[in-house]
Amino acid sequence: GKSTFLEAFGMLLIREGLKVAVIAVDPSSPVTGGSILGDKTRMNDLARAEAAFIRPVPSSGHLGGASQRAGELMLLCEAAGYDVVIVETVGVGQSETEVARMVDCFISLQIAGGGDDLQGIKKGLMEVADLLVINKDDGDNHTNVAIARHMYESALHILRRKYDEWQPRVLTCSALEKRGIDEIWHAIIDFKTALTASGRLQQVRQQQSVEWLRKQTEEEVLNHLFANEDFDRYYRQTLLAVKNNTLSPRTGLRQLSEFIQTQYFD
C-alpha cells in the first residue's frame, strides 16, 4: 500500500511542476544485516520520471525506521533543488518518533480493518502524526474506512495537540483509484502555512539540526570508544560474563562506566 500511495502522490506533485525525492528506508535483516531494497521497483512510473529521485536506504536495524544517513540525504536532496523530500519509513509502528523529529510534516498511513487502525492508536503514532491518512478507500472497504475515520477523529479530540497552531486531520484516499490524493497535498500546504505564519516551522527546523548533532555526536563517541582496543576487549569480556550469568547486567554497566571514567577522565 505504501509504494502505491507514494507513486500516486509523487506523480501528483510532478504534475504540479515540483521535483520530488523519495528516501525509501528499507527493512534490514536482523540476521544478515541485508535489506530488500525493493521499494524502487514497486514505483515504476515515479522511478522513470525525470523530476523524481528515489533512493532506497537500508534501515540498519533502527527501530524508528530511519537510516543513520537519512537526515544527511534529506539535506542533499534539498540542496540539489528537490522541492519535496519524502521519507518512507519501515512502517513497523515502533519508535516512529525518531522519524517525526527528522521531518517537517509526519503522515501516518493506515488501512482500515485487520486491526491496523487500532494499532495506530495503541502504538502512539497519533501523538506524533500531523496527518492521518486511511488508504484503500475503495471496493468493499468504504464502510471499514468510515468506521476507522470516526475512531481516529474521536481519539484526536482527547489527545493533546502536538502544535497549538494545527489540529491533525484524518483523511481518506484510494491510491489505487487515484482518489483523495490532492486533498492530502492541500492539507500539507495548509499545515506548512499555519506553522510558517507562527514561526513554529523555523523552530522545528532548528530542533532538527540540534537533534542531528546530538545523534551524530553519540555515534562518533561510540565509534571512538570501540576503536580503543582496551575498551573493546573489556567490553567483550563483560558481555561474556553477563551471558554466563557470572555478572549482572547492572553491575556490568557500572564496571564499564568506571572503566571509561578511568581511561578518559581521570
Model-derived segments and spans:
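Long, well-ordered amphipathic alpha-helical subdomains in the mid-to-C-terminal portions
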Residues: 172, 183-261
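Flexible active-site lid/hinge loop adjacent to a nucleotide/diphosphate
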Residues: 114-143
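Alpha-helical scaffold elements adjacent to nucleotide-binding pockets in ATP/GTP-utilizing enzyme cores
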Residues: 36, 73, 98, 102, ...
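Signal for well-folded cores of large energy- and translation-related assemblies
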Residues: 10-14, 41, 71, 75-78, ...
